[in-house]
């Protein structure tokens, strides 16, 4: 059973304590009414994993845990089998005692692009919106964060996160809650807020930016990573039925237009930190994610276009500050 009591106890003692006015009731409602049909199967996989305290833990350069003595073949097979019960693994990679989860996305590449542009994360309380399996939460802890909180309503991601946490010695510095951003009150409590790979899925992108701003302390930093297109500050692509085979893509602005949106929401010191083409080396099918991936979503004769004829995925990182 996945429980949230440790998180409640943790925030009861800090500046997130006011969240407890609504959070336990939201989680209780989720447990009672909203659990996925496969959730018990996934949570059983987590329960059957051994809780191991790593002899060596590297969260600075990767998410890697090692034991002092190699695990037995039987132990490794058990861990491998249980983790495969949580497929597909989209965000990673993870190296856990010799079990290497080669995820669809090389999320470590994204982190290496983003990290040089961030304010020092040492001692910070961080929110990661749409955090997936929580890979970047662990990298934030590795970069010195005091507490990293992720929210993502996808319940498989919650189970993947809890599986990794258990294999990292039940580390309590990172937490994932099965919520969407619209379920959060204006907490105004996080030093840094990340939203990576979320904005283009929102029907109202400016509302999403306001929601992110409402989670920041004054002088807090927003890190926004999203799909963009080439163009000036007035350029926005509104795809038809699908973009790269995704149905739920609503608005893809240019990076200059996105900068303008952030400024319109009252954020300051907005800068375009990085713009990068997504390659089929960064997002691809693996043995841990065996269905279609980016190569299947691009025009087979012209990888500069999606199968629908739109510009191929281009991603930008923008950094802004709340005054």
Curated annotation (Swiss-Prot):
* Source superkingdom: Bacteria
Instruction: Print the keywords alphabetically.
Output: Transferase, tRNA processing
- Annotated positions binding carboxy-S-adenosyl-L-methionine: 91, 105, 110, 130, 152-154, 181-182, 196, 200, 315
Q: What does this protein do?
A: Catalyzes carboxymethyl transfer from carboxy-S-adenosyl-L-methionine (Cx-SAM) to 5-hydroxyuridine (ho5U) to form 5-carboxymethoxyuridine (cmo5U) at position 34 in tRNAs.
Q: Which residues form the signal peptide?
A: none
Q: Name one GO molecular function term.
A: methyltransferase activity
Name the residues that span the membrane: none
Family recorded in the similarity comment: Belongs to the class I-like SAM-binding methyltransferase superfamily. CmoB family.
Q: Which gene encodes it?
A: cmoB
InterPro entries, alphabetized: CmoB (IPR010017), Mo5U34_MeTrfas-like (IPR027555), SAM-dependent_MTases_sf (IPR029063)
In terms of Pfam families, this protein maps to:
Methyltransf_9
According to its UniProt entry, the protein's GO biological process terms are: tRNA wobble uridine modification
* Its EC number(s): 2.5.1.-
Q: How is this protein named in the record?
A: tRNA U34 carboxymethyltransferase
Show the catalytic activity: carboxy-S-adenosyl-L-methionine + 5-hydroxyuridine(34) in tRNA = 5-carboxymethoxyuridine(34) in tRNA + S-adenosyl-L-homocysteine + H(+)
Q: Subunit notes for this chain?
A: Homotetramer.
């Amino acid at each position: 059973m996945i429980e949230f009591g440790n998180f409640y106890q943790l925030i009861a003692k800090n500046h997130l304590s006011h969240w407890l006015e609504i959070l336990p009731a939201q989680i209780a409602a989720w447990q009672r009414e909203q659990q996925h049909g496969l959730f018990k199967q996934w949570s059983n996989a987590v329960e059957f994993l051994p809780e191991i305290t790593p002899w060596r833990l590297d969260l600075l350069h990767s998410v890697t845990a090692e034991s002092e003595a190699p695990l037995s073949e039987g132990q490794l097979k058990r861990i491998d089998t249980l983790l495969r019960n949580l497929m597909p693994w989209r965000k990673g990679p993870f190296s856990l005692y010799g079990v290497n989860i080669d995820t669809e996305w090389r999320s470590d590449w994204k982190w290496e692009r983003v990290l040089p542009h961030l304010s020092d994360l040492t001692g910070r309380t961080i929110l990661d919106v749409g955090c997936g399996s929580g890979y970047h939460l662990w990298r934030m802890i590795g970069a010195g964060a005091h507490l990293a909180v992720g929210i993502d309503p996808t319940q498989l991601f919650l189970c993947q996160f809890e599986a990794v946490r258990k294999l990292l010695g039940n580390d309590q510095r990172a937490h994932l809650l099965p919520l969407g951003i619209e379920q959060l009150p204006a907490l105004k409590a996080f030093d840094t807020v990340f939203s990576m790979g979320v904005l283009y899925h929102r029907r109202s992108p400016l509302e999403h930016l306001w929601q992110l701003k409402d989670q920041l302390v004054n002088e807090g930093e927003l890190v926004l990573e999203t799909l963009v297109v080439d163009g000036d500050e007035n350029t926005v692509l509104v795809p038809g039925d699908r973009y790269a085979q995704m149905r739920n893509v609503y608005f893809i602005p240019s990076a200059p237009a996105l900068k303008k949106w952030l400024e319109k929401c009252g954020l300051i010191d907005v800068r375009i930190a990085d713009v990068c083409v997504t390659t089929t080396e960064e997002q691809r099918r693996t043995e841990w994610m065996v269905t279609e991936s980016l190569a299947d979503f691009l025009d087979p004769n012209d990888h500069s276009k999606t199968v629908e004829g739109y510009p191929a995925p281009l991603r930008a990182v923008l950094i802004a500050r709340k005054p």
